[in-house]
Amino acid sequence: MAASLPLVFTAPKRGMPPRHLADLDSAERKEAVKELGLPAFRADQLARQYYARLEADPEKMTDLPASVREKVGESLFPTLLTPIKHLACDSGDTRKTLWKAHDGTLLESVLMRYPDRATLCISSQAGCGMACPFCATGQGGLDRNLSTAEIVDQVREAAAAMRDGDVAGGPGRLSNVVFMGMGEPLANYKRVVAAVRRITSPAPDGLGLSQRSVTVSTVGLAPAIRKLADEGLSVTLAVSLHTPDDELRDTLVPVNNRWSVSEVLQAARYYADKTGRRVSIEYAMIKNVNDQPWRADMLGKKLKKALGGLVHVNLIPLNPTPGSEWDASPKDVEREFVRRVIAQGVSCTVRDTRGQEIAAACGQLAAEN
């Protein structure tokens, strides 16, 4: 195994983009408009353009006087993300976008269309500091946090692409957002929570998605899980557990050296109790590493004890990453694992894997141009 990378919780303080409308809450928007010498009603007008009409170019905002569009653009609508390329697979139902930020930082998002929904997987950091050895993003290290607006703009762009029929299947609606792209969302806590509020608030304060259709994933930053539980949000929490025992998890998910399996599950229980939401447990099935029958039994028992009925296990067939020595578990091993977890009274299914051939699946995002 390659030498392990250090854990990085604090991102370098560099490269953050200029202020954007999506960084601001309602009061801050009004103040920003006032600074520009515009009447207060323009604040809601601009927000409706961005959040309801999904328009980020003031030159196309026809209800805005032509004389102020340039000033508004410079002050509140800097170009945050420029698409470098789109890659599609799964008959066009999966589209990965490589974005370039204002400072040249690269990041990725993945739009997945299903018969009954459209889900966007978004990044919260450029790179990741959690150093999980089976994940391409974690092996690349952390460049920087994304701003609230950089996170929100990934969602606005996908919502516009769905509305305009820019993806296979014709026009539709973006229904779900998962913070499962690049980065550890809870290590960029303040901006991620602000982004969740923008994504879920109704216009003119946000994009109007249901909180229940938003999932925030974490490798298990226990104090931040508890903090999120107290935010008054009802988003789904997904915990990347990957093994039920501390000995292996210390290697697979290095943050386990800081917060053990039991501490993470206690925090998850607190989240479930506070929100009434079932917690998702993510488990990448790695051949001969974490797929043994006894680990399935232990996982089921620990989850049943910690979370009762407020838990669901998503088994994820390991997605290949460059240079990795690990493989996905065989299907018969996968099936037996599911059977054993369910036998302990815990809900468990295998996730439908999308985007593997364009390196858009879980653990594959590396933002390579």
UniProtKB/Swiss-Prot annotation:
Reaction proceeds by a ping-pong mechanism involving intermediate methylation of a conserved cysteine residue. Belongs to the radical SAM superfamily. RlmN family. S-adenosyl-L-methionine binds at G183, E184, S217, S240, L241, H242, N319. Keywords: 4Fe-4S, Cytoplasm, Disulfide bond, Iron, Iron-sulfur, Metal-binding, Methyltransferase, rRNA processing, S-adenosyl-L-methionine, Transferase, tRNA processing. Disulfide bonds join C121-C362. It catalyses: adenosine(2503) in 23S rRNA + 2 reduced [2Fe-2S]-[ferredoxin] + 2 S-adenosyl-L-methionine = 2-methyladenosine(2503) in 23S rRNA + 5'-deoxyadenosine + L-methionine + 2 oxidized [2Fe-2S]-[ferredoxin] + S-adenosyl-L-homocysteine; adenosine(37) in tRNA + 2 reduced [2Fe-2S]-[ferredoxin] + 2 S-adenosyl-L-methionine = 2-methyladenosine(37) in tRNA + 5'-deoxyadenosine + L-methionine + 2 oxidized [2Fe-2S]-[ferredoxin] + S-adenosyl-L-homocysteine. Its cofactor is [4Fe-4S] cluster. [4Fe-4S] cluster binds at C128, C132, C135. PROSITE patterns: RADICAL_SAM. The keyword Plastid does not apply. Specifically methylates position 2 of adenine 2503 in 23S rRNA and position 2 of adenine 37 in tRNAs. The lineage of its organism: Bacteria, Bacillati, Actinomycetota, Actinomycetes, Mycobacteriales. The active site is at E108, C362. It is found in: Cytoplasm. GO terms for molecular function: 4 iron, 4 sulfur cluster binding; metal ion binding; rRNA (adenine(2503)-C2-)-methyltransferase activity; rRNA binding; tRNA (adenine(37)-C2)-methyltransferase activity; tRNA binding. It comes from the Bacteria. InterPro entries: Aldolase_TIM, Methyltransferase_A, RlmN_N, RNA_MTrfase_RlmN, rRNA_lsu_MTrfase_RlmN/Cfr, rSAM. This is Probable dual-specificity RNA methyltransferase RlmN. Residues 114-351 form the Radical SAM core domain. Gene3D superfamilies: 1.10.150.530, Aldolase class I. Pfam families: Radical_SAM, RlmN_N. GO terms for cellular component: cytoplasm. Binds 1 [4Fe-4S] cluster. The cluster is coordinated with 3 cysteines and an exchangeable S-adenosyl-L-methionine. One of its GO terms (biological process) is rRNA base methylation. The keyword Metal-binding applies. Its EC number is 2.1.1.192.
